[in-house]
């Protein structure tokens, strides 16, 4: 038979192990979405979570101003993307718009190309692609102000805002 003090010590160790293994796994630390793939979650501010993309944007990006009619977005590895959305050009964010110019490709990868150009551009925190419906291209714009202001637009624009992955 064990002494009562040893039994208490064993109990404390077991409870501590339980807390470490099971409770901390709910708040798994991450750097990218692939760190969270085991649960189908996304990495938001360094924690795996299953919140909606729109809620993640509100948590992830300080002082973002979203038009109330914007109701959804999509997670991508480096950006949150919004369909039918543009920058509010009257806002400080919109006034940093840089017109990269027209991009045309032989397929529909022009959007990806615009996004990759933003990743290579100093201080780019957002990109916008306005598709030209009759071709495989469109206009590419970059934004540098860290306080995005977004509003609904026509059906041909796609907006991407950088994710603040730790």
UniProtKB/Swiss-Prot annotation:
Bilayer topology term: Single-pass membrane protein
Keyword set includes Transmembrane helix: yes
Disulfide-linked positions: none
Subcellular location: Virion membrane; Host cell membrane
A GO CC annotation given for this chain: virion membrane
Keywords: Early protein, Host cell membrane, Host membrane, Membrane, Transmembrane, Transmembrane helix, Virion
Membrane-traversing stretches: 2-22
Induction notes from the record: Early structural protein.
Virion surface face residues: 23-166
Record carries keyword Nuclease: no
Parts of the chain on the Intravirion side: 1
Family indicated by similarity: Belongs to the asfivirus envelope protein p22 family.
Name of protein: Putative membrane protein 162
The organism of origin for this protein: African swine fever virus (isolate Tick/Malawi/Lil 20-1/1983)
């Amino acid at each position: 038979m064990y002494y009562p003090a040893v039994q208490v010590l064993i109990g404390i160790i077991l409870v501590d192990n339980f807390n470490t293994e099971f409770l901390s796994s709910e708040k798994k630390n991450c750097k990218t979405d692939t760190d969270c793939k085991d649960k189908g979650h996304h990495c938001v501010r360094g924690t795996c979570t299953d919140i909606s993309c729109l809620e993640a944007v509100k948590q992830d990006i300080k002082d973002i101003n979203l038009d109330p009619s914007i109701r959804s977005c999509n997670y991508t590895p480096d950006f949150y993307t919004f369909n039918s959305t543009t920058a509010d050009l009257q806002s400080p964010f919109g006034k940093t718009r840089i017109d990269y110019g027209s991009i045309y490709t032989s397929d529909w990868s022009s959007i990806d190309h615009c996004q990759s150009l933003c990743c290579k551009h100093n201080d780019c925190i957002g990109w916008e692609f306005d598709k030209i419906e009759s071709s495989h291209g469109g206009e590419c714009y970059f934004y540098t102000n860290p306080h995005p202001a977004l509003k609904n637009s026509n059906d041909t624009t796609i907006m991407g805002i950088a994710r603040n992955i730790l």
